[in-house]
Amino acid sequence: SIFVSYLTSYDGVKIIARKDRNINEPVDLKQKMIGIVPGTISQILLDSFLSYNKIFIKELKLKHYKGSELPNALVNGEVDAISIWEPYAYFAQKRLRDLALKIPTYRVYRTSINMAVMNDFAAKNPILLQKVIKALIKAVDFMKNEKSQAQNLIAEILDIDINLVEEFWKDVKFTIGLDQLLIITMENEIRWAIEHGIVSSPVIPNYLDFINYEILEQVKPEAVTLIREAK
């Protein structure tokens, strides 16, 4: 079960296009070749984006890649735009420089980073998981209050470009919680997976059954804003 979320983003997955392919706004993607990673958040974001902008998927041309292949595909001109998560969106923009256009996605899809454990482990170790949450709260406070130091530490530990870390920081919200949008997002994702034949069962689970909110309630009750039965 998920017992805490500590990062959310409406910009963790991006649509990056080439300006030299006459793409300036969403409608310009019609009849263009778009690179995606099928069956992933790359495709989910694109579908959500198209629906928001009233563009039919049949009006595009899709080409499938692995995530790590998409920056090269865009830079080499194999595709006109890509839908991809970080850090690959950053890599594509960095290499294309002024030719890169990040198309606004209008907050149509939120990603989150969550922590989850097996139910039996949670039942046997509630105090340990409360300590994990307390450590996460301290870490989030540190990242908010000592941003520069935190960014440099992450760049050093992960051995990555500090500019990548700084760009990532702009796109995310560090926050401890469990909110209703987490469940709504998972429900939308399973509906999408059913529609695309990725899962065989047509049943949408009750995702509240997969969230152990009691642990976070013991540590930071105001951070739990899920809709649930009153006790």
Residue ranges and their predicted role:
Residues 28, 72-73, 91, 168, ...:
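Well-formed, non-transmembrane alpha-helical positions, independent of function
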Residues 75-79, 172-187, 215-224:
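Short amphipathic alpha-helical segments at helix boundaries and their inter-helical linkers
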Residues 21, 63, 68-157:
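Pocket-lining segment of extracytoplasmic ligand-binding domains
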Residues 124-202:
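Secondary-structure end/capping motifs
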Residues 194-231:
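Conserved C-terminal helix/tail region of periplasmic/extracytoplasmic solute-binding proteins
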Residues 1-56, 61-66, 80-86, 100-105, ...:
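Short, glycine-/small- and polar/acidic-enriched structural segments
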Residues 9-15, 111-115, 119-120, 190:
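Small-molecule pocket liners
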